[in-house]
């Protein structure tokens, strides 16, 4: 935000996510991490688009999408290995439900009154 020259007042006016997903169980943590790590992986595509479209470089103005930088693929593979190691011993339906809840909460925060609420089945 600082790279985009947003003033303190503009930053303070941005909506806050006040309904974070639950993370009280290992299943909830893994489900939430699936969404976060998947978004991090997808951020690489967004970063390239922002660079090409807006002419920004070096992550300035879009560093959120660059997170792990060149280590993004390696971090995704590490998460997949962790998920694969734990998932067989846990309740898979709970992991999926937590991923859906995490996605729903962040989606609803972003659209906040500008679109239809999303709810995973």
Language model feature labels by segment:
Residues 1-121:
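Metal- and O2-centered redox machinery and metal/ROS homeostasis
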């Amino acid at each position: 935000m600082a790279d985009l020259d947003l003033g303190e007042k503009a930053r303070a006016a941005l909506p806050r996510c006040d309904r974070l997903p639950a993370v009280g169980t290992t299943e909830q943590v893994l489900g939430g991490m699936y969404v976060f790590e998947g978004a991090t992986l997808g951020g690489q595509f967004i970063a390239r688009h922002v660079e090409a479209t807006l002419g920004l470089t070096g992550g300035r103005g879009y560093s959120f999408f660059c997170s792990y930088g060149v280590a993004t693929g390696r971090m995704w593979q590490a998460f997949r290995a962790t998920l694969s190691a734990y998932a067989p011993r846990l309740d898979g339906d709970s992991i999926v439900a937590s991923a859906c809840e995490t996605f729903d909460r962040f989606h609803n925060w972003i659209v906040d009154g500008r679109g239809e609420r999303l709810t995973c089945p």
